[in-house]
Amino acid sequence: MATGEPRDRGGYYFRFLPQRTFSSLSAREITNRLRQWSMLGRIQAQAFGFDQTFQPYQKDDFVTAFFKDPNVIPHLQLLAESSGQWTTLGTEVKRIEAINVPCTQLSMSFFQRLYDENIVRESGHIVKCLDSFCDPFLISDELRKVLLMEDSEKYEVFSPVEREEFLFCLFKHLCLGGSLCQYEDVLKPYLETAKLIYKDLVSVRKHPRTKEIQITSSVFKVKAYDSLGVCYPSPKEHEQTFSYFVVDPIKRHVNVLYHCYGVGEMA
């Protein structure tokens, strides 16, 4: 049997946690930013509990069980491609794909190099450039060149491994936004929002002996397939359509961050 193909529910049982809210996505200042970035109404976080010990190598069994669980099926939200309304999956998952996403960053100093390399001025303003396209994104500043253009001279400011980091992925998703994204002139809103969402989703603990802060969560980028192809996060694939599962093995919680690329709420 191929990796990721459902066998049974792998011993995991889940429960929806509607009482777990995510202030990083609901605070007024953040919703105003998400509206400007054309992501409001198209991004959501949900929490689920589970009842078994979790190890990262069990990710395929874990995610397969998640999509099969009767306590998940009526609650897991996604945007319908046709109506653009929130709905549930409504199809049987035949196969899953769960990719490990490194999650090691404990500080926003990770992005200091944007200042050091003159991608962002000391004032916080993002350096502009001549407009170009990296389909489907308009590139009008040095930040988006660093994020998208592999042949740009400063693309190597972040290594391939660093670009896989969950914090970098969040930051990039916010910078690129939805289909009618209005870009920021300054860096601060992107950094602040990425930090808030990251802290809201990722669990840490203090090591009992060394007192060092450690990240305890494991992160996976997830897709699910039915008999026709990709069904989750959306049948229509896009770099800005994603679902991340952030698993806390100590609390036995999984936070699901979902976004579907399109036109966000404007009013």
UniProtKB/Swiss-Prot annotation:
InterPro entries: CFAP300. The keyword Magnesium does not apply. It comes from the Eukaryota. One of its GO terms (cellular component) is motile cilium. It is found in: Cytoplasm; Cytoplasm, Cytoskeleton, Cilium axoneme. Keywords: Cell projection, Cytoplasm, Cytoskeleton. Transmembrane segments: none annotated. Cilium- and flagellum-specific protein that plays a role in axonemal structure organization and motility. May play a role in outer and inner dynein arm assembly. PANTHER family: CILIA- AND FLAGELLA-ASSOCIATED PROTEIN 300 (PTHR31078:SF1). Belongs to the CFAP300 family. Interacts with DNAAF2. This is Cilia- and flagella-associated protein 300. It comes from Rattus norvegicus (Rat).
